[in-house]
Amino acid sequence: MVATVREHRIGDVRWTIVRGPREAAFHALGAHAAADIRTVLDGLPAWPVTARARRSPVLFRAIESASQVEHPDAYAELTALAAGAGVPFDDLLLANLRGDLGAGDGTGCTDLAWAPSLLGHNEDGAPVFDGIGRLLTLLIDGEPGVCVWWYPGFLPSNTCTVTTHGLVWGIDSVNVVTPSPCAGRHFVARTAQRATSVAEAVSVLRSHASAGGFAYTMGQVGSPSLVVVEKAGHDTAVTTVDSGFSWHTNHFRQLPPSLDSASEESLARAEVCAHLAPVAPDAKWLVSALTSAVHRNASDGDELMTLSTVVTDLASGEVTVVPRGGGPLRARAADLALGDIDAVTALNGAIPGE
C-alpha cells in the first residue's frame, strides 16, 4: 500500500506529515529526509559512542536483540527508515542507541511543569540538528496519531510527544553509567506512544526494561494530573506532581544517584530551575522561563543548544511551539496529532507552505 509524506511550513516551524502502513510510511519518510539524515550521521559527535560499541560489542548486540524482540514494530520502523534513506542500518542503529551504551548521547533537555495542567519542554541537542529538526506527525494505519519534535534519522520518540489520545510528555536524557542488556530507550518510548492514558503509559514503562535512562514528564489533555517517570534498566520511579512547580534536567532525582552520571551543566541548570519562582504560572510564563533562564546556545563550553520549546496547557489543549530563533506556533494538541494542517493554519493566520 502507498504511503504519503507532506512537507509544510507554518511561520518558522517545519511540519512533516506521514500517512500509511508502518513500513511503507517509514520507508517514504527516510527517502523524503535522506539528505538531512546523512547530514545528521556526518555531523554527530559520535566517537565516544562508536568507541564504546567497539569495546563492548556483546552489549551493543544484546541491546539490539532485546530491542528487536521486545519492540518489533519500532525495530521494523528503523529498518525501513534506513532503507528509505539509503544509509546503513547499523549507522542509524548506533545513532539511536547512543544513550544506551554508557558513553553519553549528546542530548540534554529541560522539563518544567506546574500542577495540575501546565507542561513545558526544552529540546536540547547538537548544533547539527539546528535548522533540520521539525514537527513530525505520524498517522500509521490502525494506530493513534502521534506528533513529535523529530531528529532526522531517529525513531520519533526521544523528544516530546502529543497523541490523539491526548497524551503529552517531554523526555530528558539521563546517562546511565552501567547499562543493562535491555532494549534501547528510544524503542521503549516508541511503544509507550500507543498508550491511551497516563496510567497505561506508566504501566508500559514499568513493564519494559530500558538500557539507557529517560525521565518523562507527562500528562493528558483534559485530565488535571501530572507525573514524572524516571526509567533505567528494570528500575522505575513514578512521582505525582500534586501541586506547585516541578522541574527535571539530565540526572535522576528519585532513582538512586549511583545509576547515572550527572554533568556539571545539568546540575547548574537544575540549580536555576530550583530557584525559579512563578508568581502567576501560565503557559506564557513557562515559555518565557524555557526560552530565557535555561535556554542553551552551544557556547562557553556547552556543546548543546536549545532547538525548540514546547509548552502544553492540558486544561485547554493548546500547545505553543517555539523553534530556535523563530516565532511561536499555536496549535491544539489534537490538531497536531491528527496532522490537521488547515486547523493549525487558521489558528495562526498563516498560509501553509508545501
Where are these regions (language model features)?
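Gly/Pro-rich turn-and-neighbor structural signature
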Residues: D90-G120
